[in-house]
């Protein structure tokens, strides 16, 4: 999940970099009434705040629309006289370094908050798993009783499907809990 969000963050970086190549810095985005750069930076700040929430999807939809709009207009413009693509790239990199580092740090802080919550939750998840495992004998005894009843009702095939499904679910849960244990045993993020 976090890797997907980081991919989205890369898309938002493109949004800001594209804003820097607008020939007319005073031109406003109709939807926001602000300049391209101001709009792009707002989207990035919002992303940093929403990195651990459902709000990210809506932000990314808006960001993609802005990127498309920026690119359409940029394609229709020529570079100013005396400006090479190399020089433009250098200017963009310098501007990005000054403007984006604080925003990236905010996004990083959001991801660290999510990781910290996972560290705090892991012991509880493992405790729940232990409880489930302690009841496994009861669970299989219940299934055995169902099997006995199913034989009388000639429902062997149906019960086999239920039992196979439960076995698959148990194996999946064990795999998930192994991942949780690894997360719990890893050092927490630096404060």
Swiss-Prot record:
Which body tissues produce this protein?
Answer: Plasma.
Cellular component terms per the entry's GO annotation: high-density lipoprotein particle
The superkingdom listed in its UniProt entry is Eukaryota
Q: Which GO terms describe its biological process?
A: lipid transport
Compartments reported by the entry: Secreted
Q: Does the keyword Secreted apply?
A: yes
Leader peptide range in chain numbering: 1-23
Q: Which UniProt keywords apply?
A: HDL, Lipid transport, Secreted, Signal, Transport
Name of the protein in its database record: Blood plasma apolipoprotein LAL2
| Species whose genome carries this gene | Petromyzon marinus (Sea lamprey)
Lineage, highest ranks first: Eukaryota, Metazoa, Chordata, Craniata, Vertebrata
